[in-house]
From Swiss-Prot:
It is found in: Secreted. This is Phospholipase A2 homolog P-elapitoxin-Aa1a gamma chain. Belongs to the phospholipase A2 family. Group I subfamily. Heterotrimer: Snake venom phospholipase A2 (PLA2) that has presynaptic neurotoxicity. Inhibits nerve-evoked twitch contractions but not responses to cholinergic agonists acetylcholine and carbachol and to depolarizing agonist KCl. Causes a fade in tetanic contractions. Displays a triphasic mode of action with depression, enhancement and blockade of neurotransmission. Does not display myotoxic activity such as changes in baseline muscle tension or inhibition of directly stimulated muscle twitches. All subunits are necessary for maximum toxicity. It comes from Acanthophis antarcticus (Common death adder). GO terms for cellular component: extracellular region.
Length: 20
């Protein structure tokens, strides 16, 4: 479960926050 390289920490974090 490794996120894409340099995907966009802000967008990635937002996605995780949305899941929680």
């Amino acid at each position: 479960s490794i996120p894409l390289p340099s995907l966009n920490f802000e967008q990635f974090g937002n996605m995780i926050q949305c899941t929680i």
